[in-house]
A protein has these predicted regions:
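A composition-driven surface/loop motif
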Residues: 1-175
Length: 175
């Protein structure tokens, strides 16, 4: 498991960049990429000309405790409790075999790259927001997002955002 946990008090503007260059990462029992805490955001960058694959198994054993003290399952191959940005000119394939592919409990941004998500339930989930396509870009030729869900009767979604806060829970697609 590749885990990110940065002390928000010591590093309130903390940022971590994960440069993927032909990575294949899998874990049968926990999320292969897990972001516990970060001050600003974690960026996952698929480098130009590379294909990167992140896959989880069919059952997760990992959980986290939220700010209300509730224990929740970690239910994505890429799972972030804080802001997450996906970018780069390479290819990222995410296989969410347990439940979801990419899960972000805050803001999820997919700026560019070729992203394919295969999920047992929801493909891409951003609790506060999902934003696809850098709003400052003028060329979206390096952006491609494909979501495949194999959810049978569970009613999974391709792209999902839902928040109890009235100004959150939205999806924006530029391109």
């Amino acid at each position: 498991q590749l885990a990110v946990n940065v002390d928000k008090t010591a590093e309130p503007e903390g940022k971590v960049v994960l440069n993927l260059e032909g990575l294949t990462l899998s874990n049968d029992s926990v999320a292969p990429i897990y972001v516990e805490a970060i001050g600003d955001e974690v960026q996952i960058s698929a480098k130009n000309g590379t294909t990167n694959t992140i896959s989880d198994g069919t059952s997760h054993t990992d959980t986290y405790v939220d700010s209300d003290g509730n224990t929740n399952p970690v239910n994505g191959a890429i799972f972030s409790r804080d802001d997450l940005k996906l970018k780069g000119k390479g290819t990222l394939i995410v296989n969410g075999n347990t439940e979801d592919g990419i899960v972000c409990k805050n803001d999820l941004k997919i700026w560019n790259g070729s992203i394919t998500v295969n999920a047992a339930d929801d493909g891409i989930r951003g609790n506060d927001s999902v934003r696809i396509g850098d709003p400052d870009a003028t060329d979206y030729s390096t952006l491609s997002v494909t979501v495949n869900t194999n959810n049978g009767s569970t009613g999974g979604d391709g792209i999902k955002s839902n928040s109890t806060e009235t100004d959150k829970g939205y999806i924006t697609i530029n391109g």
